């Protein structure tokens, strides 16, 4: 029966990682409930949700991922209504860390490595996710048009970003050392730096700048959005 799930997921273009996760969560549920899929009812579904939350003490976000996998199979593939009435647990929203403009400047001033400084500026100035930033290549940039292309953003979607005048100036100072247009902007031995390495750079910069907030890469993106709302002219800086 799960073969149908795998086939449908592949037809709809889900990634290999997502296909594997959906199959994994559905197998775990069937192992727990000890029934054939067509025999599963609403009580079974709720009992499993209670088990995940109360006994395994999984966080709502993790449970919701599992629930999405199960609902897709039972509702979309075999038209079983067992999970229709099961509501997703509420996920507590974390308040993002937002840095002041002064703190951003202090982080940049505290960073002596040119590549690390540009990495911080790029994420903040263009509002990039860390995964997007580390995967950027030189040929994703159009300096003349002051634009950049994100090829694999959230949901694997493409989008364009605006490059500020300051960022373009610093990119032009940094790029001459890179001759291959298909090269990653931020790389080590011709490979992109990892997300963990980028997080370490940002965390270290905040520490050197004397910032006591919990600062990770996403704080730069959150700060960009906040500052942009406060002053739309920043987009042209």
Name the predicted role of every residue range.
Residues 1-234:
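Conserved catalytic core of the tyrosine transesterase superfamily
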């Amino acid at each position: 029966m799960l073969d149908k799930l795998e086939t449908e997921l592949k037809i709809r273009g889900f990634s290999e990682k997502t296909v594997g996760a959906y199959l994994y969560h559905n197998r775990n549920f069937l192992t727990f409930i000890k029934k054939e899929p067509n025999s599963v009812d609403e009580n079974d579904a709720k009992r499993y949700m209670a088990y995940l939350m109360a006994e395994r003490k999984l966080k709502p976000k993790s449970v919701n991922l599992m629930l999405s996998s199960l609902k897709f199979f039972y509702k979309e593939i075999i038209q079983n209504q067992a999970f229709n009435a099961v509501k997703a647990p509420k996920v507590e929203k974390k308040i993002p860390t937002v840095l002041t403009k002064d703190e951003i400047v202090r982080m940049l001033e505290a960073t002596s490595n040119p590549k690390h400084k540009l990495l911080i500026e790029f994420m903040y100035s263009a509002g990039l996710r860390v995964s997007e930033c580390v995967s950027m290549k030189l040929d994703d940039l159009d300096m003349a048009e002051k634009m950049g292309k994100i090829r694999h953003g959230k949901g694997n979607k493409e989008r364009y970003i605006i490059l500020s005048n300051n960022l373009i100036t610093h990119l032009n100072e940094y790029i001459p050392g890179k001759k291959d247009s298909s090269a990653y902007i931020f790389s080590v031995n011709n490979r992109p730096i990892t997300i963990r390495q980028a997080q370490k750079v940002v965390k270290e910069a905040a520490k050197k700048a004397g910032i006591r907030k919990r600062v990770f890469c996403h704080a730069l993106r959150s700060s960009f959005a906040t500052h942009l709302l406060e002053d739309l002219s920043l987009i042209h800086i």
